[in-house]
Design a protein with these regions (language model features):
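Active-site-proximal loop/turn and secondary-structure-junction residues that shape catalytic pockets
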Residues: 69, 125, 238-241, 343, ...
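Active-site loops and adjacent core secondary-structure elements that bind or stabilize anionic groups
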Residues: 1-197, 215-233
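Glycine- and Gly-Pro-enriched alpha-helical subdomains that act as flexible
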Residues: 71-112, 243-342
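Bateman/CBS regulatory modules and CBS-like beta-alpha motifs in cytosolic regions of diverse proteins
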Residues: 124, 203-214, 343
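C-terminal binding/interaction regions
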Residues: 117, 121-122, 135-165, 170-172, ...
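Flexible, glycine/charged-enriched surface loops at secondary-structure junctions
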Residues: 56-64, 164-167, 231-238, 268-279, ...
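Gly-rich Lys/Arg/Thr-decorated short loops/hinges at beta-loop-alpha junctions or inter-strand turns
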Residues: 22-34, 109-115, 188-209, 286-308, ...
């Protein structure tokens, strides 16, 4: 098949719409549903990300995409009991497969932003992963293959309309890519930079020059994630998964703040006071996610005031105070941070430190590099200048 007609483009008024190949066949097949224009943008960006993550780490990988940026990305490291609980996957009797773990991590890191996502899997979608996908609100999934049992489950999702795409994992695109804006064609070489080389960590200007193997792995995950995130972007990673992604901000510090806030929320969800919230039986996942998100923030009264808390809880929870939140966040350790371009000022490092960042990889090259290095040294943070910019538009 050389082309696939779509219902419409970005918006319903943008017709006609299609995806096509000028030469050869499309390297994908729609196994179920009718994916749209934005679905394919998400699917193809997400597929590149997870394929590159698996190639770089040797682990199956998954990503959760919304509006052409990842809400989450992860490799399939085993889940702790705490993560199983906050990701709502603690009801499986058998240990989760690596690809199911990767999906649970990618989907669970930022559940608010992953609502209605498009998912990418780097390897075969098995039955466990399909069962996890089935119970989440999602637009579709792309993977190189599906077990028959998994495909049967996914074909039942969303009254049979769930989008399932199979992609040829051996497909390699042309080295030159094109796009049109306002009738004008842009051409550039594909971004083929490889983010696995030890050269990424060869230039370490900070006093602390120690990167553990786990830190290097997490920084590589951060950089690969940023390679497929709308710029400007910053990514916090811990234990093989993105825990906070700040995408599409015009200011670097706003990226760092946004991603840091998401990372803090991820960590606060593991606080015993949050994990033991007395939710009513039968509350929907989306309502639980929204309620936890508000409870953690300073506007917690939106779910705790009289006449409201009764909708969600069996008894009124105590407030999670600012002091409790600060103390809990301080217990986080060994967070890695990547940036798609240089940090212009040390304020980014100050904000990163508040979210327990210990390792940083960024391009370097700011006229204020000295200020950034000095701020890292102030907190004994190890920072590498990669000399690689990762803008994505």
């Amino acid at each position: 098949m050389k082309e696939l007609t779509l219902k419409y483009g970005c918006n319903p008024n943008q017709k006609p719409s299609k995806i096509f190949m000028e030469e050869g066949q499309l390297p994908l097949e729609v196994l179920n549903g009718r994916p749209g224009y934005i679905n394919f943008l998400d699917a193809l960006n997400a597929w590149q990300l997870v394929k590159e993550l698996q190639d770089a780490t040797g682990w199956p990988a998954a990503a959760s995409f919304k509006h052409v940026s990842p809400a989450g990305a992860a490799i399939g490291l085993p889940l702790t009991d705490t993560l199983k609980k906050i990701y709502f996957v603690d009801d499986f009797d058998e240990p989760l497969s690596p690809i199911a773990c990767a999906y649970a991590r990618a989907r669970g890191a930022d559940r608010m932003c992953s609502y209605g996502d498009f998912v990418a899997l780097s390897t075969t979608c098995d039955l466990q992963t399909a069962l996890l996908l089935k119970r989440e609100v999602s637009d579709g999934v792309i993977a190189p293959s599906y077990t028959p049992e998994a495909l049967a489950v996914l074909r039942e999702k969303r009254k049979g309309t769930y989008n399932v795409i199979q992609i040829d994992p051996t497909y390699v695109p042309a080295p030159i890519e094109h796009k049109q804006v306002f009738g004008i064609t842009f051409e550039q070489g594909r971004n083929e930079v490889h983010l696995t080389d030890d050269a990424l960590f060869a230039d370490v200007p900070t006093r602390n020059k120690t990167f553990t193997p786990e830190a290097k792995r997490d920084l590589i995950i951060a950089l690969i994630t940023l390679k497929y995130t709308q710029s400007n972007s910053v990514c916090y990673v811990k234990d093989g998964q993105a825990i906070g992604i700040g995408a599409g901000q015009q200011s670097r510090i706003h990226c760092t703040r946004l991603a840091g806030s998401k990372a803090d929320t991820w960590w606060l969800r593991q606080c015993p006071k949050v994990m033991n919230l007395p939710f009513k039986e039968g509350i929907r996942r989306a309502d639980r996610d929204n309620t936890i998100d508000v409870y953690i923030r300073d506007d917690h009264d939106d779910v705790l005031r009289d006449g409201v808390w009764q909708q969600f809880f069996t008894e009124k929870p105590a407030i999670l105070t600012r002091e409790e939140k600060r103390d809990w966040i301080a217990q986080n350790t060994n967070v890695a941070l990547g940036s798609d371009a240089f940090f212009p000022f040390g304020d980014n490092i100050e904000r990163a430190h508040k979210s327990s960042v210990q390792y940083i990889a960024q391009a370097g090259g700011s006229i204020r590099d000295d200020n950034v290095i000095e701020t890292c040294d102030k907190y004994d943070i190890a920072m590498a200048f990669t000399h690689v910019r990762l803008f994505h538009h």
